[in-house]
């Protein structure tokens, strides 16, 4: 095995000609948004068009770039091919046309309430319909904390179960609905209409599911910090991703403290972190592990993000500390 086969950068992702979907995720507070912004910035250098999507209800993209984003792709200031959007994968935000079925006499909201999670599945399908129609070269997802992300990635199987339950309901109650429809002059609930909408949603999800499980098209980048809970959750996340057949070959370790003269607290924390860095090295010896430093200022604004993003492709050298434009001496 060559020494540089698992180089400590994300060059393998940046240089991939086929990757379409890139997920960035991990425990809350580890720097997922900063990392996803940095990944998108590096991709914008080599791709025709890049879309960065936040599925985290906290929506930190606007804060990171210092620019307001909405649920429609917006060009990031300072770029010509990088777009960003912030979405909430909930039925209230993403699937109004599904809820309009109520005007035909069918209250879909009540129906989806009977099948836990299917409303989220339909909403996610609507997001993917939109994203696919826009035809960006690559899409980067800034995801919510681990549990929420795994739910989204598990949606295809959830939707299959929901549709099977719906079809069973249709078979069992079609006679009742038809009778009600006759009494109301044909304005009662249309199960056929409902089935068409769900089947359309299922088709999109199935197509996306195939792509998500294709390592040439999709990869996941876990972000962690060298502390017990973060390392533990990262390992659990990677195990779950493996069960879902989703590729993961990169790990980003953020907020690393390096030794400093006359800083006993820094040195004590660095010593504590070393134990977990050693664990990460043992666990992910066959991964691209990128190490990022804890900085003295927040990484906010395009100039700082551009500078920080370089650390994803050029390993950090603590002998030449990174100084951000907004950093005070």
Swiss-Prot record:
Residues that coordinate or bind ATP: 27-34, 227, 254
UniProt: Zn(2+) binding residues: 263, 266
The species this protein was found in: Dictyostelium discoideum
Stated family: Belongs to the arsA ATPase family.
Protein encoded by which gene: arsA
CDD domains in the record: ArsA
Protein's name according to its UniProt entry: ATPase ASNA1 homolog
Keyword annotations: ATP-binding, Cytoplasm, Endoplasmic reticulum, Hydrolase, Metal-binding, Nucleotide-binding, Transport, Zinc
Entry EC number(s): 3.6.-.-
């Amino acid at each position: 095995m060559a020494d540089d086969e698992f180089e400590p950068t994300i060059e393998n992702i940046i240089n991939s000609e086929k990757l379409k979907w890139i997920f960035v995720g991990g425990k809350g507070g580890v720097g997922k948004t900063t990392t996803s912004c940095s990944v998108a910035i590096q991709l914008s250098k080599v791709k025709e068009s890049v879309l960065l999507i936040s599925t985290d209800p906290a929506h930190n993209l606007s804060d990171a770039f210092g620019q307001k984003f909405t649920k429609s792709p917006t060009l990031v200031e300072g770029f010509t091919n990088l777009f960003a959007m912030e979405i909430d994968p909930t039925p209230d935000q993403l699937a109004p046309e599904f809820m309009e079925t109520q005007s035909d006499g069918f209250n879909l909201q009540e129906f989806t309430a009977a099948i836990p999670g299917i409303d989220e599945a339909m909403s996610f399908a609507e997001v993917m319909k939109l994203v696919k129609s826009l035809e960006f070269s690559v899409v980067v997802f800034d995801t919510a904390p681990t549990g929420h992300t795994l739910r989204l990635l598990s949606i295809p199987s959830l939707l299959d179960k929901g549709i099977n339950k719906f079809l069973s309901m249709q078979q069992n109650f079609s006679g009742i609905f038809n009778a009600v429809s006759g009494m109301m002059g044909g304005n009662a609930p249309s199960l056929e209409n409902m089935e068409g909408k769900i089947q359309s949603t299922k088709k999109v999800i199935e197509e996306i599911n195939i792509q998500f499980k294709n390592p040439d098209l999709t990869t996941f980048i876990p972000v962690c910090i060298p502390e017990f809970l973060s390392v533990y959750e990262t390992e659990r996340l990677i195990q779950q991703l493996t069960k879902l057949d989703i590729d993961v070959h990169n790990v980003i370790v953020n907020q690393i403290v390096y030794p400093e003269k006359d800083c006993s607290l820094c040195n004590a924390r660095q010593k504590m972190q070393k134990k977990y860095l050693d664990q990460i090295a043992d666990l992910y010896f066959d991964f691209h592990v990128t190490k990022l430093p804890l900085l003295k200022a927040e990484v906010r604004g395009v100039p700082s993000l551009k500078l920080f993003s370089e650390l994803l492709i050029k390993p950090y050298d603590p002998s030449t500390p990174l100084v951000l434009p907004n950093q005070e001496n």
